[in-house]
Regions:
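Amphipathic alpha-helical interaction surfaces in cytosolic regulatory modules
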Residues: 68-78
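Conserved CoA-thioester-binding segment of acyl-CoA-metabolizing enzymes
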Residues: 1-66
């Protein structure tokens, strides 16, 4: 079973074993959303990584950002 997906973090697995985890808030330079608890970006990255670790088809995980920035850090306005 895979992770519970959210809009602000993409989980895209290719047939060749590459898993892309993408920060998806380009309008905020992919700032981290929420808190470290269950719904925040950091918690979700952990959930996605655990799902990748449990999936024997995943050979490598690429962590990247949508748009021109990887991640600007915590969203202080949230």
């Amino acid at each position: 079973m895979g992770p519970q997906l959210v809009d602000y973090l993409l989980y895209e697995k290719e047939d060749n074993g590459i898993l892309w985890i993408k920060f998806n808030r380009p309008e905020k330079m992919n700032a981290l959303y929420g808190t470290a608890e269950s719904s925040g970006t950091v918690a979700k990255v952990g959930e996605y990584m655990r799902a990748a670790d449990d999936d024997p088809e995943v050979r490598v995980v690429v962590l990247t950002g949508v748009g021109r920035g990887f991640c600007s850090g915590a969203d202080l306005k949230e």
